[in-house]
Amino acid sequence: MSPGQGTQFFRAGARLPERPGHDQLMGDVTVRLAGPADADSVGQLLRDFNEEFDTHGPTAAEFTGRFNTLLARGDVVVVLADDHGRDVGFALLTLRPTPYYDGSLSQLEELYVVPELRDRGIGSRILGAAIETVRAKGGVEMHINVDEIDEDARRFYEHHGFSNIEAGSNHRMLFYLQEL
């Protein structure tokens, strides 16, 4: 199947399709694409995520300012989960061109669900909607960086088809970082 074939495009604020099997666990949680009007909420969720894992970084207000710009771009995707009017989770993805494919590569930068609502299928719904959206935008591959010691995250992504071994290879892929 070619990128985007059999998928649906979603506009910011559009409700994404229901996923069978999670209705009982998720209750009234809905998943939708974020737009610029959601910058405050996404900024606060990202700050909450950073605080939960003792990560220093921008304030919620600084994140909000950045999301005001990012959410208007076509190469940034944010999927939000909403529970009775309260945003309770999100995924942030960026897309970039590559000479290896006709479509784009996507990087799943962050995926977060508030602690009290974890293990209810919300993260799976968010990830599923993110994958559908990236495919609809012509994406052909999605990358995610996961800390080696974060076994829960590794198990989650592996359950959803991610691997740290490239097809046809027998060795793990590694991620390297240099602060600039």
Language-model regions: role of each:
Residues G6-A37:
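Conserved N-terminal entry element of GNAT/NAT acetyltransferase domains
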Residues S124, E148-E166, H171-L174:
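Conserved active-site alpha-helix within GNAT-family acetyltransferase domains
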